[in-house]
Structures are given as structure tokens and as C-alpha cells.
Amino acid sequence: MIGSLTARIFAIFWLTLALVLMLVLMLPKLDSRQMTELLDSEQRQGLMIEQHVEAELANDPPNDLMWWRRLFRAIDKWAPPGQRLLLVTTEGRVIGAERSEMQIIRNFIGQADNADHPQKKKYGRVELVGPFSVRDGEDNYQLYLIRPASSSQSDFINLLFDRPLLLLIVTMLVSTPLLLWLAWSLAKPARKLKNAADEVAQGNLRQHPELEAGPQEFLAAGASFNQMVTALERMMTSQQRLLSDISHELRTPLTRLQLGTALLRRRSGESKELERIETEAQRLDSMINDLLVMSRNQQKNALVSETIKANQLWSEVLDNAAFEAEQMGKSLTVNFPPGPWPLYGNPNALESALENIVRNALRYSHTKIEVGFAVDKDGITITVDDDGPGVSPEDREQIFRPFYRTDEARDRESGGTGLGLAIVETAIQQHRGWVKAEDSPLGGLRLVIWLPLYKRS
């Protein structure tokens, strides 16, 4: 097996070219209608018939008035069973031929006229053999044998040889499966590499040993790809560990700050400055909690999955959100509630994902929020619409990044930490789903979540 892709393509090209040239050179010779040499047995049979006909003519005195009759008698007597003999005079007259055969006989006589080198050729269901030289006194005749063809060539084969374009088309059709297989085998490593790259793009950092096989070029690319995946996985693990460690380390001074604030309130009473310190401490505490949640969600091994039904998973989240909306003077409508659709995943992560986008809508809406659920044979689609200020098209892809903030009024004063939607995207992608932002028919932002249904294998 050739290891280099370049050498393999080069070899396939020249092999294909050689096969085409071989076909071009050899196919005409495979046409059974071509002039071919006689076998030794056929040569001996022809010479023996030639001698018998000459002897018969020598024993039959010539008759100037009925000269052709003695020729008929001679060829009829010595014609082999199932075959016929023809005699051609020096003037070109054919003795013993039928009218329907004259065209092919004339064609053969025009190609085979050397008695020292007799040949044979097939014409459909008959075959002509000759010529052999017959002497009759001062006259010379050419003797031909007409017999049934041993294996007549089919009309379709004849059509192929007579029409080169049709032969080319048939050759292309016959060679197409082989060429498709060759193309598939050459492209197979590229498809594997592409699929592995797609998995990495979706956040699935795992090595693919099968990439380190095949042609040398793809083998080297596969090895480099696996090294890259290992480096990315190591970097992501280090980043998540660092994020988790920082969050835990921030807990201690934050706890001390909250304790000091409580002691200061007890001694000095309430004040605007103290209230501001408490507010910022609470926000910092929320941010640390969100960082820890996101760090845990990014580590797939930390997610304990189970089978759960959608209505059991999200009913409480929707009830609580409806109550909060009522307290805020807003309306939350569930157009189509979730049904008993099976999902497989971590209940806490999935519950938190919907809760985050619903709270996001509550936070930024003016008066109205709508939640809808739809299901098909593949998965569940959840839409959350609000009538708030919305998000510009250029910011929609960015709002799922940690700490990303738009230029509008969606800032920290609204109560957010900038991590909610990042947590949502991480959780949904962990469950092989996706989340995206669109314009809402209510005038604000629409967030769409899709999750695959659980199908028992």
C-alpha cells in the first residue's frame, strides 16, 4: 500500500491513463467481426476442399454453353455439411451465392483476395472463409467457404464497436463505481478530520486515534490535531480550575466584609454608605456564585445526568416566574406549557438554564413576557419573548460571552452579573442543544433554546 497521498494520487492517475489507453488499443481487436487468421485445422480443411474441387472439375469435361453447371456440381459435391462453397471467376462473377448474401460477399472479397493468405470474418450469423485458389485448365477461380458463425456477436456489442461515442459512455458508466470508490477512499480521512474538528467546535475536546491512520499527510495532520486537542483540554482544565480557585479564595474576604458590615450596622445604625457597601457585596457574592456554577457546568464529569420529563422539570420555574412577574406589575404568559417529554441530563443545570433566560426577560421587559414550548420527533424548542429594549444584531452573538455587556441600558444597575446567559449556553451545549437570540415579535429580545429528546436505544 502506498503511504503518501501524493504518490497515491499520482499512481491512480497513471493507472487510469494506462487502462484507458489499453482499452483504446485493445477493444478494436476484440471485435469478432474483424479479419482474423485461419487456424491450422481450417487451413488444412480449405486446402483439401480446394484439391477435391480441382479434381472434380478435371473429371467433368467443360461445356461452353453450360459452363457454370459443372462449377455448381463441383462445389455442391464437396461442400462440408451445413456449409456452402462459392467460386469467384476472374471477371468477378460469384457462383453459388444467394442474392441476399451478395453485399457481404462483395465486402469480404474486397478485403480478402490473396489465396496465399486466406482469412475469415464474421458477418452477423454467418462467417466467410477464403480465398483458396482453384485451377481449371487455363482458368483460375477463387474458392470461398460460407458457414454459420460459431458464436455470433450480439447486436448491442456491434452497436458499441460501430459507435465510439456510445462505447465511451458505457466505459464511463462501468468505471464510475471504481472511481467513486477511489474518491471516497481518498476523501475518507479528510471527512474524519472535518467531523473531529466539528466536535471540537462544539466544545467536545476528545482525542481521535482513528485520525492517525491512512496516508502520511493525513496521519501527520491527525497527530497534530490530537496534540492540539490535548493542549486545548489541558488549557481549559487549568482555566476552569483557576476560575474555581479564585472564586473560592474570594469567599473568605467577602465573608469578612459581610461580617464587618453587620457589626458596623449594629454599632452605628443604618446609613447610605453602609447600604451601598451591602449592595455591592451582595452583587459580588452573586457573581462568585455564578462563576462557580459556570465552572462546574463546564466540567462535564461534574454533571450527573438522569431521565426526567419536561413538565416536571420546568413547571415550578414557570410558576415562580409568573408570581414574580405579578409582583413586578408585569404579565408572564405560557402559550403552550411543557408536556411529559423525556429529556436526559442534569436537572439542576436544565432548570437553571430556563430560569436564567426567564429572569433575564423579567429584568428587561416593560410589561409583557411570553414563554412557548414546541416539540417534534427530534427535540424541544423553548422560546422566551419580552417587550424590552432588545439587542442589536451585532450584539446577539456576543451576549452569551461571560461579562459581555451591550451599549444599551442592560448594565450592572439592572441587577445582572453578566454571567447568566453564559451559564445558559454552557448548560445547553453540555446537553447537545443550542441557544440563540433573535428579534421578538413583542418588540424586544427572543431567546430560543433547543434540546434533543431522549430516545431509548
From Swiss-Prot:
It comes from the Bacteria. One of its GO terms (cellular component) is plasma membrane. Changing T252P: In cpxA101; a cpxA gain of function mutant, decreased autophosphorylation, decreased phosphotransfer to CpxR, loss of phosphatase activity, responds to periplasmic protein overproduction. Residues 30-163 are periplasmic. GO terms for molecular function: ATP binding; identical protein binding; phosphoprotein phosphatase activity; phosphorelay sensor kinase activity. The two-component system is activated by envelope stress such as overexpression of some (misfolded) periplasmic proteins. Activated by spheroplasting (which removes the periplasm) in an autoregulatory cpxA-cpxR-dependent fashion. Cpx two-component system is induced at pH 8.0; in a degP deletion mutant induction is halved. The kinase activity is inhibited by periplasmic accessory protein CpxP; proteolysis of CpxP relieves inhibition. Residues 1-7, 185-457 are cytoplasmic. Its cofactor is Mg(2+). Its main location: membrane. It catalyses: ATP + protein L-histidine = ADP + protein N-phospho-L-histidine. Autophosphorylated. Maximal phosphorylation of the dimeric isolated cytoplasmic domain (residues 188-457) is about 70%, suggesting the protein may be hemiphosphorylated in vivo; probably occurs via a trans-autophosphorylation mechanism, i.e. one subunit phosphorylates the other. Disruption phenotype: Loss of the Cpx envelope stress response. Decreased resistance to the antibiotic amnikacin. Single cpxA and double cpxR-cpxA mutant decrease transcription of degP. Decreased transcription of cpxP. Hypersensitive to alkaline pH (greater than pH 8.8). Decreased numbers of stationary phase cells bind to hydrophobic surfaces. Greatly increased resistance to hydroxyurea, probably due to decreased recognition of mis-folded proteins which eventually leads to decreased OH radical formation. Changing S185R: Nearly complete loss of response to excess periplasmic protein. It holds the Pfam family CpxA_peri. Phosphotransfer to CpxR is stimulated by Mg(2+) and/or Mn(2+). Changing G222R: 75% decrease in response to excess periplasmic protein. The active site is at H248 (nucleophile). One of its GO terms (biological process) is cell adhesion involved in biofilm formation. It is found in: Cell inner membrane. The periplasmic segment (residues 30-163) defines the sensory domain. Conformational changes in the cytoplasmic HAMP domain modulate the mobility of the central alpha-helices (which bend at Ser-238 and Pro-253) that allows formation of 1 kinase-active state. NCBIfam families: PRK09470.1. Histidine kinase member of the two-component regulatory system CpxA/CpxR which responds to envelope stress response by activating expression of downstream genes including cpxP, degP, dsbA and ppiA. Activates CpxR by phosphorylation; has autokinase, phosphotransferase and (in the presence of Mg(2+) and/or ATP or ADP) phosphatase activity. The kinase activity is inhibited by periplasmic accessory protein CpxP; proteolysis of CpxP relieves inhibition. This is Sensor histidine kinase CpxA. It comes from Escherichia coli (strain K12). The gene is cpxA.
